[in-house]
Curated annotation (Swiss-Prot):
Gene from which the chain derives: atpA
Reactions accelerated catalytically: ATP + H2O + 4 H(+)(in) = ADP + phosphate + 5 H(+)(out)
Protein name (Swiss-Prot/TrEMBL): ATP synthase subunit alpha
Protein family per UniProt: Belongs to the ATPase alpha/beta chains family.
Cellular component GO terms held in the UniProt record: plasma membrane-derived thylakoid membrane; proton-transporting ATP synthase complex
Organism: Gloeothece citriformis (strain PCC 7424) (Cyanothece sp. (strain PCC 7424))
Length: 503
């Protein structure tokens, strides 16, 4: 009979206990109570954080937006068709991040930074938080460098500086996107990284924009972020933050960046949809109470950094669509108050054939004048005033039959200045070209040229300067100001070209 030794048994048990090593996985899990319309209500998830990423059973990712006493409200970043009532949801412990880096340049990505251009994966290991804090007061510096748009009317009267936020506002089909695209095209050779964010647009429209940028060689320094109209509202709401995050990476590397949000009205509508589905109380125009913060925290990320942080900049050109020119609606007034000025596009001017259809009277740049090139400042100082006076006189002259010679001269000058500022799409001008034509218009050199021929004259003058007076573009390009020598060359060129033009 085998004798049982208690000490041997106890040592075996002790060994077994010591060698027992089971990995315990603790996860924050919840259950779907209700799902539909791109939102889900989840029971559990006691430790969920605001804006935390949640993973559903079918692989769909959501974001925790409402943290309530007994449930969590989440928005889905997918269709959610595979999610059922009672299915499990896991908290990931991560806040939304997007990939960033040089590899994104010349690519088209969705609101989560995933490539959608069919050119394979994006090779980058770096990510940034989707919602990063904006640079503080000490980190910033005054706007001091120009961001040339290549559009004479803007660069002369409503100049934009690097690090500025300039709103482009107007009715549908007034050329808002055209101004933004021209600005991107004009950054060629300027070492500026551009990010174009398309929010809630037709996929065909985005494809057209990409074609234009590719044709002009602008995709080499541009990232396109697209959340089209058939994407979930969550992605349309997140897309602008993705664009800002991608640009922020380059800004902190000391580069100049330009971000275009086309357009923030659709982002606000997507956010309104999400908020109403999450049963948040509606406010004015049914928008939630924090819709101002939605845009202010986005646009505050645009800045000109100080030299200690590398002197990089992020210039924001948000676009807002108005209804029948109503700039006093909720979202337009919000964004006007956040930005550093606005470029107002008028459908009346557009239909009358004045393109870009910029209404100089109510367009303003609050900080750009500090960044305007000296040459343009010297030349275009009186331009806005002249055009404003002309607009007033034009309205008055419709009722007056006999006008004195001075008024007639001012009306004639105004008509020609308006013609000078007309510009075809996708053909931005260099600073010296803008300086030359504005100088000719303001100093009366075009007064005896019929308005219908002003465009032909200015085009010819630019070609004449380029070929016969190459020193003029060189001086203005290098010195950034209109020196006496440059001015005499310009006067000479205008005189010589005019003789041949009128002969």
């Amino acid at each position: 009979m085998v004798s049982i030794r208690p000490d041997e048994i106890s040592s075996i048990i002790r060994q077994q206990i010591e060698s027992y090593d089971q990995q315990v996985q603790v996860s924050n899990v919840g259950t779907v109570l209700q799902v539909g319309d791109g939102t889900a209500r989840i029971y559990g998830l006691q430790q969920a954080m605001a804006q935390e990423l949640l993973e559903f059973e079918d692989g769909t990712i959501g974001i925790a937006l409402n943290l309530e006493e007994d449930n969590v409200g989440a928005v889905l970043m997918g269709s959610g068709y595979g999610i059922q009532e009672g299915s499990t949801v896991k908290a990931t412990g991560r806040i939304a991040q997007v990939p960033v880096g040089e590899a994104l340049v010349s690519r088209i990505v969705d609101a989560l930074g995933r490539p959608i251009d069919g050119k394979g994966p994006i090779n980058t290991n770096e990510t940034r938080l989707l919602e990063s804090p904006a640079p503080g007061i000490v980190a910033r510096k005054s706007v001091c460098e120009p961001m040339q748009t290549g559009i004479t009317a803007i660069d002369a009267m409503i100049p934009v500086g690097r690090g500025q936020r300039e709103l482009i506002i107007g009715d549908r089909k007034t050329g808002k996107t055209a101004i933004a695209i021209d600005t991107i095209i004009n950054q060629k050779g300027e070492d500026v990284i551009c990010v174009y964010v398309a929010i809630g647009q037709k996929a065909s429209t985005v494809a057209q924009v990409v074609d234009t940028l590719t044709e002009k060689g602008a995709m080499d320094y541009t990232v396109v972020v697209s959340a089209s109209a058939n994407d979930p509202a969550t992605l349309q709401y997140l897309a602008p933050y993705t664009g800002a995050t991608i640009a922020e990476y380059f800004m902190y590397k000391g580069k100049a960046t330009l971000v275009i949000y086309d357009d923030l009205s659709k982002q606000a509508q997507a956010y309104r949809q999400i908020s109403l589905l999450m049963r948040r109380p509606p406010g004015r125009e049914a928008y939630p109470g924090d819709v101002f913060y939605l845009h202010s925290r986005l646009l505050e990320r645009a800045a000109k950094l100080n030299d200690q942080l590398g002197g990089g900049s992020m210039t924001a050109l948000p676009i807002i669509e108005t209804q029948a020119g109503d700039v006093s609606a909720y979202i337009p007034t919000n964004v006007i108050s956040i930005t550093d000025g606005q470029i107002f596009l008028s459908s009346d001017l557009f239909n009358a054939g004045f393109r870009p259809a910029i209404n100089a009277g109510i367009s303003v740049s609050r900080v750009g004048s500090a960044a305007q090139t000296k040459a343009m400042k010297q030349v275009a100082g009186k331009l806005k005033l002249e055009l404003a006076q002309f607009a007033e006189l034009e309205a008055f002259s419709q009722f007056a039959s006999d006008l004195d010679a001075a008024t007639q001269a001012q009306l004639a000058r105004g008509q020609r200045l308006r013609e000078v500022l007309k510009q075809p799409q996708n053909s931005p001008l260099a600073v010296w070209e803008q300086v030359a034509i504005v100088y000719a218009g303001l100093n009366g050199y075009l007064d005896d040229i019929p308005p219908a021929q002003v465009t032909t004259f200015t085009q010819g003058l630019r070609d004449y300067l380029r070929n016969s007076k190459p020193k003029f573009p060189e001086i203005v390009g290098n010195e950034k100001k209109l020196t006496d020598e440059a001015e005499s060359l310009l006067k000479e060129a205008i005189g010589e070209f005019k003789q041949g033009f009128t002969a």
